[in-house]
């Protein structure tokens, strides 16, 4: 009996220690995150290390395989691996799945590289903007050249694109060595 209690106590402390090192959403609806020491955040089942670049971290996320494939197809790896700083609004695989059937397959074809590049660079803003910098009504000029509009209600940040579509930040402030990623739930579209 004493061994069983000792074993259960040890297991409980191990679980608490593990929980203290992993970031998990405090609320999927609010987008709030609990951060661990060092600001390492879990995204797509992988730790996002602040010492790594945007590309290095995104490549480890199971939730961003479509985005990484698109960045490669557009020839943007070297740019997003560069010094920056950049703020990247990173759509998940599920965000890409919301697009009409065949859209991603069409965009990653070599003959559509210019359109793909336009869409991807519309998700990038020069400089490092934390969630606290994304104030209601703020206009963000993207690398693509058009703007995104921030809508904010409490801690929830939503971006409005050039076509009037909206995308919610689900995981904010994923710090990188060359900027910050904010995970979003819908692909943003330029005009």
Regions found by a protein language model. Give the residues of each.
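Short N-terminal signal/transit or membrane-insertion segments
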Residues: 14-15, 29
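Bacterial N-terminal signal peptides that target proteins for export
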Residues: 1-13
């Amino acid at each position: 009996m004493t061994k069983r209690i000792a074993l259960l106590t040890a297991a409980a402390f191990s679980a608490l220690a593990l929980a203290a090192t992993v970031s998990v959403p405090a609320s999927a609806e609010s987008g709030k995150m609990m951060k661990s020491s060092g600001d390492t955040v879990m995204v797509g089942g992988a730790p996002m290390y602040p010492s790594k670049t945007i590309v290095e971290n995104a490549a480890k996320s199971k939730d961003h395989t479509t985005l990484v494939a698109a960045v490669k197809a557009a020839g943007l790896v070297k740019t997003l691996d560069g010094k920056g700083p950049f703020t990247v609004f990173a759509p998940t695989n599920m965000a890409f799945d919301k697009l009409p059937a065949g859209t991603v397959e069409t965009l990653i074809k070599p003959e559509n590289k210019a359109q793909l590049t336009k869409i991807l660079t519309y998700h990038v803003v020069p400089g490092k903007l934390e969630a606290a910098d994304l104030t209601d009504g703020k206009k963000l000029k993207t690398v693509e050249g058009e703007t995104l509009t921030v809508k904010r209600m409490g801690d929830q940040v939503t971006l409005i694109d050039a076509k009037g579509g909206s995308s919610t930040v689900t995981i904010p402030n994923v710090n990188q060595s060359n900027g910050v990623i904010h995970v979003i739930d819908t692909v943003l579209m330029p005009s």
